[in-house]
Amino acid sequence: MNLQAYPELTLSLQWANPRKDTAFTAHRLALPRHAVTRAIKHTIVHPLALIKGHQANSRAHAAEITVRIVDAVEGQALNRQYRAKDYATNVLTFDYALSPVLSADLVLCAPVLAREAAEQGKDLRAHYIHLLVHGTLHAMGYDHEHSQTGAARMEALEVLILQGLGVVNPYEA
């Protein structure tokens, strides 16, 4: 994909583990900043990833995204506070604005991603990339929880975007 076509991205990548224990070391190695940047930018500019609810040619020309990698305690607390679900989930998306600048926070729970990747026999980096794409699509207005049509559309778009990033279809792996 043409790098010049990418929108301006202001990215804050946060690792919520002040103790820097060894469990997070593997995650830091699996998810370098350039991989996060590429996944988000590729999602935003994908030809089919138009911003939902806007004109047919509506795209983000700039984005301000915070990606925070958390432990299970913080992941569960955020999920409880904002979704009334008392467990840590793999990704939470807090979308603030679609236009003129796409603005969102993506929270990924490291232990949940590690467990899911191991259970599903997936590469940890590929699983992170999948959930970054998934969370970015949520920030762009896509939803899979309220209709089967929306879920099918979002899943198909994820697969196309991931293919462009060199990641195998996570729903067939």
Language-model features: locations:
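An acidic/histidine-cluster motif and surrounding catalytic segment
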Residues: 1-127, 137-173
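Charged, glycine-interspersed solvent-exposed loop segments at helix/strand-loop junctions
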Residues: 130
